[in-house]
Amino acid sequence: VQLSGEEKAAVLALWDKVNEEEVGGEALGRLLVVYPWTQRFFDSFGDLSNPGAVMGNPKVKAHGKKVLHSFGEGVHHLDNLKGTFAALSELHCDKLHVDPENFRLLGNVLVVVLARHFGKDFTPELQASYQKVVAGVANALAHKYH
């Protein structure tokens, strides 16, 4: 990901304030509500029948936290995203057969959730930096597909 030193510092500073459980659960929940076809990868999660069920589902929240923790690893290794996500790329490609477009969708949902959580602190400049980061992470996760 091509970020200036200032952009990297801003991304890291915000990330240090992120509550992985809250933001991760909300981001994954929103992905499953807004793009319902993504639910097919989460059959074992129980009731995903309506937005309230999805957003209140403890398995969605737990997996969202796990997803966001992995994303945080990427935030701390922006110069080696492909290496950081190599094993997850292989898992999602070879075993889970996840459409790589879903990584882009989740990244965009994450940006929405960060904006909601951080309000005016999530400036347009910071959003631009995070859009670069989520695009880089999505590309790294899709790497095994190429």
From Swiss-Prot:
Matching PROSITE patterns: GLOBIN (PS01033)
GO molecular function: heme binding; hemoglobin alpha binding; metal ion binding; oxygen binding; oxygen carrier activity
Record-level GO cellular component terms: haptoglobin-hemoglobin complex; hemoglobin complex
Tissue/organ expression: Red blood cells.
Listed CDD domains: Hb-beta-like
UniProt cross-references to InterPro entries, sorted A to Z: Globin, Globin-like_sf, Globin/Proto, Hemoglobin_b, Hemoglobin_oxygen_transport
Sites bearing S-nitrosocysteine, chain numbering: 93
UniProt keyword annotations, A-Z: Acetylation, Heme, Iron, Metal-binding, Oxygen transport, Phosphoprotein, S-nitrosylation, Transport
Modified residues (N6-acetyllysine): 59, 82, 144
SUPFAM superfamilies: Globin-like
GO annotation terms (biological process): cellular oxidant detoxification; hydrogen peroxide catabolic process
Residue ranges of every copy of the Globin domain listed in the record: 2-146
Modified residues (N-acetylvaline): 1
Self-association and partners: Heterotetramer of two alpha chains and two beta chains.
Listed PANTHER family: HEMOGLOBIN FAMILY MEMBER, HEMOGLOBIN SUBUNIT BETA
Protein name: Hemoglobin subunit beta
This protein's encoding gene: HBB
